[in-house]
Amino acid sequence: MNIMINLIKNKKIAISLYYVIAMISFFVPRQFVPIIYPIRLIVPLIGILLIALTPTVTIRFTQVFPFLILYTFGVLNGVKNEEIVMLLILAILFKDDLNQLFKLNFWFIFLYIIITSPLATCGIIHNTVIEETRGIRHGFFFTHPNQFGLALVTCLTSLFYLYKAKLTKLPWYGFAAILILSIFLLNNYVMTRTNTLICIILLVLVLIDKFVDLNRFAKFLYLAIPATIFLVFLLTFLYPLDIVLINKLNEALSGRIGLQAMAFENYSIPLFGLNMHFGNNIRPGVYDALDSAIYNFSYTYGLILFVYVFTLFTKMTKKVSQSNPFILVPILVLCLTGITENVLLNFVYNPVIILVCASFIFKSKGATV
């Protein structure tokens, strides 16, 4: 017991132990899933315990509480979201350095593509990890020219941003983290597509930083983020009124507003969420998928948690608008693209959101959530 305590006092060893436990729990043959599933639910909590016991990291329950709530609600509603806690742990480790958070994300994007593309193309990943994954089934990035081009643009913009921002160095456990995340997020083509857009926008911001004062647009960016979230629900509620402008917008969005209105008419918005099946369909085998990430989030986690997260999100963006409007831009992009993409606000699919949110929660000295 004393040996174990001495081991976990070292932050790097504690992180390594957690990665080993997580990997063991993840790489299990499908026939053993019913046996291993309870273990997979416990593993992230073991990770939090290991990190919490390290003397170099100080966290409080109020700081961890939002992520634990998201994790719990996700488990209850069938969301496999062990990655939430993994990202929380990474956020804790890099809580004092915002550059480290973004450095981790951009290195992750780069290595994610470099590592997973050839493995998926050769069929190695498909045969050993996740059989039903859409991206891997089609050869992932290397099969379709547009996906390969997207991967190439992502790599180049990521590296250029790292170079311009002088974020080219990363500790060894940071590389370990992104390698593990690459394995956990093999099937998240949507996440990579969104990160590409974020990379391009950040690249532009880096280039024009000397010529444009983003502080002048901080208030607009801050108001635009909650306004985007509110607009999604407003359009859903107004759709049955047969307003010409909303009907045209619904056609432009391939009927997504109509699907949201149908879901609201049939199910309202549950207080504690619904079990969303594969493909984000409410009814298995029937296409009534909620293609809006904002609307989907309220169904997956429930109205109560959505209001809580929305309030936290709004407070965070207000704080950022006063200190660093640079970071509001990718958050706004996520919200806007979240109107038509169904998983962009799901923390499992997008490490950018949880890292940015965590960074500002933890950088508030003495503040509670």
Locate each region found by the language model.
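Hydrophobic transmembrane helix bundles of membrane-integrated enzymes that assemble
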Residues: 2-29, 36-244, 265, 285-368
